[in-house]
Amino acid sequence: MAQADFIHDGAVIDYTPGADVTAGDVVVQGDLVGVAKLDIAANAPGSLAVEGVFDFAKEAGGGVTFAVGDLAYWDDTNNVAVTTDGGGANKLLGKVVLAAADGDATVRVKLTP
């Protein structure tokens, strides 16, 4: 028996939520962060993107800025991208690919698989 069998490239993963998920929702499972590209009904199979480039909500006007190449983290409590891991409470999204100023409402991030 093989030690591993190839399943697929891994840009998306299977996901069956316990509650409805709306397209664009960020889903955190342990240290894995994915984005729903389509609506997923509760208890129905769907998928989450775990690779790709997305615009994530960020605090606007709170002094939060991002430079290209910065690490971005997801604050699942406040549903925004942040600059720190919050002592492990915030999960790594990936690297910033478009700078975001303090007044910007979003930051563009390449997900880290």
PLM regions: where:
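Surface-exposed, low-hydrophobicity beta-strand/loop segments enriched in small/polar/acidic residues
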Residues: M1-P113
